Regions:
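Residues that act as N-cap/strand-start positions at coil-to-secondary-structure junctions
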Residues: 21-22, 49, 82-84
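A short, N-terminal "cap"/entry segment at the start of jelly-roll beta-barrel domains
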Residues: 1-36, 113-127
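Short histidine-centered beta-strand/loop micro-motifs
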Residues: 26-27, 38, 45-50, 66-67, ...
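A cytosolic small-molecule/anion-sensing beta-strand core signal
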Residues: 31, 59-60, 75-76, 94
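Short, conserved beta-strand element in jelly-roll/cupin
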Residues: 39-40, 49-67, 101
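Structural motif
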Residues: 34, 43, 62-64, 71, ...
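Short acidic-glycine-tyrosine-enriched beta hairpin
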Residues: 68-85
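Ligand-binding loop in jelly-roll beta-barrel domains
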Residues: 84-114
């Protein structure tokens, strides 16, 4: 992924090419930030990112961000930022397409390593 985009990116097309659930793929870079798309269904894992905020934007469907003291329900077009250090668990009761914006240093599942954890190298694979 080049830091200088030479063409526009269709988020709809990009997310349709993602084969695995909970496997974000980088579609753009802005300074020290990756813009990613993902297909999600079910739940990921309770985790936190000690030093990074994480932005979720729902492109299609519904997403619930479970927090230790409640949950945030997101519909298409809704955005929510999970502040650094806050434990959270993304959940989609049916397939949902999301856009994530996070610093390049952000680990996929933060402080939790699971079979769903994807490395940055995996997220950078071409679609």
């Amino acid at each position: 992924m080049s830091s200088k985009m030479r063409q526009s990116v269709s988020l709809t097309d990009a997310v349709s090419k993602v084969q695995e659930l909970w496997s974000p793929r980088v579609v753009a870079e802005v300074d020290d930030v990756y813009v990613k798309v993902a297909r999600v269904h079910g739940q990921l894992a309770w985790h936190s990112h000690k030093n990074e905020d994480e932005l979720f934007l729902v492109l299609r469907g519904r997403l619930r961000i479970e927090l230790e003291h409640g949950a945030i329900e997101l519909n298409e077009g809704d955005v929510f930022v999970v502040p650094k250090g806050v434990r959270h668990n993304p959940v989609a009761d049916s397939e949902c397409h999301i856009l994530l914006i996070e610093r390049k240093s952000t680990l996929h599942t933060g402080d939790a390593i699971t079979e769903q954890t994807r490395s940055v190298a995996e997220q950078l694979r071409p679609l």
